[in-house]
Structures are given as C-alpha cells and as structure tokens.
Amino acid sequence: WGTSGAPGRTTLAVGIATALSAHASTLLVDADTANPTIAHLLGFPVHASGLSSLARTASRGPITPADTLGASVMRSKNLHVITGLVTPHRWREVSKPGIESIVGALRLSARYSVIDVASTCLEKASRGASRDDAALGVLERADRLVIVARGDIVGINRLSFLARWWREQERDIPVEVIVNRVSTAAIGPHPVPSLQAAIGAFMPDCIFHVVPEDEGVGRASLRGKALGENGARCDASDALQAIVEQWVPTL
C-alpha cells in the first residue's frame, strides 16, 4: 500500500516477493484495482486475470489452496503470481467480501503472501460498492503493512495525510514505511537525517527504510525482471534485499 501518485508500490512489492521466495513458498498478488501492472512488469500475458478467477470462486464458496495455486502463474520454484484485473474498469469483479476470502485462502496456500494494492481515497468510505473495496479489504485482513512513499517533498507530504488516515482506522498491526527513490537531488545532501526529521514529525514511532534512486530499476523493468532477479541486481535491489532480510525472522 502507499501514497497516491507513483511511489513504486508495485516495483517494491514484486521485489519483496522475489526476495522472500529465496526463503520459502511465496504468493504475489496484484490486487490493485486502479492500475493492475504486475503482469506487465514481469512480462506475463495480460488476457486473463488470476484475481478475477479467485473472486468468482469466492462467490461460489470457500477457496482452497488448490484453487489459489490453480489461479496463479509460476514465476520460479517458490514464487507464484496471481495476476490482476485485465482492465481497471472491471473493478466490480472483486468485492470486499471476495478479497477478504482470498486473503484468508492465501494463508493456507504459501508461507508468505505479498499483496499489492492501490492507494485509497482518504475520506470516509461510501455505503455502496467502491473501487477502494479491494484495498480496504486487504488492509483489514493484513498481518503486516508496508507503506511506500516517494522520497521527495511531494511524497512525504502525501505520506503525512496517509499516516493520519491510517491512525484513524485503529488497526493494531506492524507498520513500516519504505521511502523509495531517495536521492540527494530530491531530499538534500543528507537524505536520511532529513527524512528522520520530516517523518518523525507525524509518525514519531515509525520504522522507515530507504531505497535509493537507481537507473537499474528501469533496466530491470525493461527486461521484465523483478528487482534482484536473475541479473537484475542494483543498488536499489540490494537495499530492498537488506530490508527483507531484517523482516524474515519475524514473519
């Protein structure tokens, strides 16, 4: 999850799942109903949606691990991917109860699950169906939340609004922030102290991590590779790998 704009939620979600798959079975799920892009990023066919398939299964009854794996695409021995909607205008295919059933099924299907969701409207939810339903359903059922923000003035400002909204939800789960695309050009000559001061003003107890601006990210995307996958190593992937290694003992 993360701020509006393009902070790099999908890129980091894919990289996190790839790093986790080195340790145990992992499912990567594209539940971004606004801009589903994992299939595009990894070079998968985009004419069928694993998420829609699972949502239809959920409407008929409980989802089994066999259903989950059957709706996924194998990326590597330990990494399976459930691709997102074929097109964003079909967001109604994934209801809030449906995504909650999917999240529950994921826990029985792999050791780790990484779910990429869209940024949400930071206003009170409407009574009817909403494009935010999938993201809200995931946020309500998640065991851990990773918030992605872009490392510039606009990104940190957006993070402050998101942090206030999240506090109002009163969810008691571990939350960490990844500040992505950090550079001295955008933050100043001392990025980490500057970020500590800025984020500490509205998230004083927050653990945050930094992933640097890196041209290697674009090169990996052009090749259909996840960060850190088969020759797609760069400074950004090394930073993300280090973050995941910190998490693994507590997952």
For the regions a language model picked out, list residue spans one by one.
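Beta-strand-loop-alpha "switch" segments that mediate conformational coupling across diverse proteins
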Residues: 181-183, 189-228
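Phosphate-binding loop that captures ATP/GTP phosphates
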Residues: 20-81, 103, 208
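Inter-motif core of Ras-like GTPase G domains
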Residues: 108, 128-152
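Phosphate-binding/switch loop-helix module in NTP-utilizing enzymes
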Residues: 78-128, 135
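Walker A (P-loop) phosphate-binding motif
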Residues: 1-29
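NTP-binding/hydrolysis catalytic cores, primarily Walker-type P-loop NTPases
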Residues: 222-251
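Conserved Switch II/interswitch segment of TRAFAC-class P-loop GTPases
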Residues: 119-123, 142-160, 186-188
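Conserved C-terminal guanine-recognition region of P-loop GTPase G domains, centered on the G4
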Residues: 135-136, 159-172
